[in-house]
Amino acid sequence: MEEKEFKSGFVALLGRPNVGKSTLMNYLVGQKVAITSNKPQTTRNRISGIYTSDKMQVVFVDTPGIFKPHSKLDDYMDKASLSSLNDVDLVLFMVEPEEIGKGDQYIANLLKEVKVPVFLVINKVDQIHPNKLLLIMDSYHKLEGFKEILPISATQGIGIEDLLNTINKYLPEGPQYYGADQITDRPEYFVVAELIREQILRLTSQEVPHATAVAVDQMNKHQNGKLLIEATIYVEKDGQKGIIIGKGGKMLKQIGINSRKEIEHLLGEKVNLRLWVKVQHNWRSDPSFLKQIGYDKKELS
């Protein structure tokens, strides 16, 4: 009996902030591995989500959105996005269903230098009239350089099957790199820290969310059978610390409640979550601190 062909490869998700890269990856792997919010720069690190079927295994690399850097952290995030193109088999350039803007034009120009196939993926098509979508697709066709132009909705699942089938056509034959039940290459503590940061993004406003970082200090079994997780939320100013803690500790308590629910859903077990808030002045422009909390710039040099 002839052995069934199996394909595998790495696919980078690229695009401006908040275009839906993390939402698409979470939909594809069937579980939250990348956090989402309506605020730009939600994703900071390269995160991989693993999709496995009987035909192929795809490692999707969700990158930070590309934008003009204003700090060491911003610079790190842009380099993380571009470095992800060095060792992938395909690039999915994600855009929203609107006329080509300067940001998308900038990224499209960068992608002309890429040696691997680039797909243009127009997300959020459930929010636009089909006739307008056709005009937008036509304007992107004129840019050239895209092997495929695919309309999808990452929230509604529209066009996802077609996207996966098209990816399969371009992937090389290869082995299954990860177990069928593995959905990310990141350790649990990384995803846990991201889930806590997601709740900060969702519950606080203005500059506070992007002035925060989360580090998991320990994950140990406790006597009561629950998993004990201790984490520190870092902010840049005393005033931000006050906002995170809230009046009478209410905000920090709500962050903890919401985070614990998400973490328990991820890990499938009861969790005792303890949170602390500390001030680390100008941490976003401190290379040694960035490295300490997981932003290792060596791999980007």
UniProtKB/Swiss-Prot annotation:
<keyword id="KW-0690">Ribosome biogenesis</keyword>
<dbReference type="GO" id="GO:0070181">
    <property type="term" value="F:small ribosomal subunit rRNA binding"/>
</dbReference>
<feature type="region of interest" description="G4">
    <location>
        <begin position="123"/>
        <end position="126"/>
    </location>
</feature>
<feature type="region of interest" description="G5">
    <location>
        <begin position="152"/>
        <end position="154"/>
    </location>
</feature>
<dbReference type="InterPro" id="IPR004044">
    <property type="entry name" value="KH_dom_type_2"/>
</dbReference>
<keyword id="KW-0963">Cytoplasm</keyword>
<keyword id="KW-0547">Nucleotide-binding</keyword>
<dbReference type="GO" id="GO:0043024">
    <property type="term" value="F:ribosomal small subunit binding"/>
</dbReference>
<keyword id="KW-0472">Membrane</keyword>
<keyword id="KW-0342">GTP-binding</keyword>
<dbReference type="InterPro" id="IPR015946">
    <property type="entry name" value="KH_dom-like_a/b"/>
</dbReference>
<dbReference type="GO" id="GO:0000028">
    <property type="term" value="P:ribosomal small subunit assembly"/>
</dbReference>
<protein>
    <recommendedName>
        <fullName>GTPase Era</fullName>
    </recommendedName>
</protein>
<feature type="binding site">
    <location>
        <begin position="123"/>
        <end position="126"/>
    </location>
    <ligand>
        <name>GTP</name>
    </ligand>
</feature>
<feature type="domain" description="Era-type G">
    <location>
        <begin position="7"/>
        <end position="173"/>
    </location>
</feature>
<dbReference type="GO" id="GO:0005525">
    <property type="term" value="F:GTP binding"/>
</dbReference>
<dbReference type="Pfam" id="PF07650">
    <property type="entry name" value="KH_2"/>
</dbReference>
<comment type="subunit">
    <text>Monomer.</text>
</comment>
<keyword id="KW-0694">RNA-binding</keyword>
<dbReference type="GO" id="GO:0005829">
    <property type="term" value="C:cytosol"/>
</dbReference>
<feature type="region of interest" description="G1">
    <location>
        <begin position="15"/>
        <end position="22"/>
    </location>
</feature>
<dbReference type="InterPro" id="IPR005225">
    <property type="entry name" value="Small_GTP-bd"/>
</dbReference>
<comment type="function">
    <text>An essential GTPase that binds both GDP and GTP, with rapid nucleotide exchange. Plays a role in 16S rRNA processing and 30S ribosomal subunit biogenesis and possibly also in cell cycle regulation and energy metabolism.</text>
</comment>
<dbReference type="GO" id="GO:0003924">
    <property type="term" value="F:GTPase activity"/>
</dbReference>
<feature type="domain" description="KH type-2">
    <location>
        <begin position="204"/>
        <end position="281"/>
    </location>
</feature>
<feature type="binding site">
    <location>
        <begin position="62"/>
        <end position="66"/>
    </location>
    <ligand>
        <name>GTP</name>
    </ligand>
</feature>
<feature type="region of interest" description="G3">
    <location>
        <begin position="62"/>
        <end position="65"/>
    </location>
</feature>
<comment type="similarity">
    <text>Belongs to the TRAFAC class TrmE-Era-EngA-EngB-Septin-like GTPase superfamily. Era GTPase family.</text>
</comment>
<keyword id="KW-1003">Cell membrane</keyword>
<feature type="region of interest" description="G2">
    <location>
        <begin position="41"/>
        <end position="45"/>
    </location>
</feature>
<dbReference type="InterPro" id="IPR006073">
    <property type="entry name" value="GTP-bd"/>
</dbReference>
<dbReference type="InterPro" id="IPR027417">
    <property type="entry name" value="P-loop_NTPase"/>
</dbReference>
<feature type="binding site">
    <location>
        <begin position="15"/>
        <end position="22"/>
    </location>
    <ligand>
        <name>GTP</name>
    </ligand>
</feature>
<dbReference type="InterPro" id="IPR030388">
    <property type="entry name" value="G_ERA_dom"/>
</dbReference>
<keyword id="KW-0699">rRNA-binding</keyword>
<dbReference type="InterPro" id="IPR009019">
    <property type="entry name" value="KH_sf_prok-type"/>
</dbReference>
<dbReference type="Pfam" id="PF01926">
    <property type="entry name" value="MMR_HSR1"/>
</dbReference>
<dbReference type="GO" id="GO:0005886">
    <property type="term" value="C:plasma membrane"/>
</dbReference>
<dbReference type="InterPro" id="IPR005662">
    <property type="entry name" value="GTPase_Era-like"/>
</dbReference>
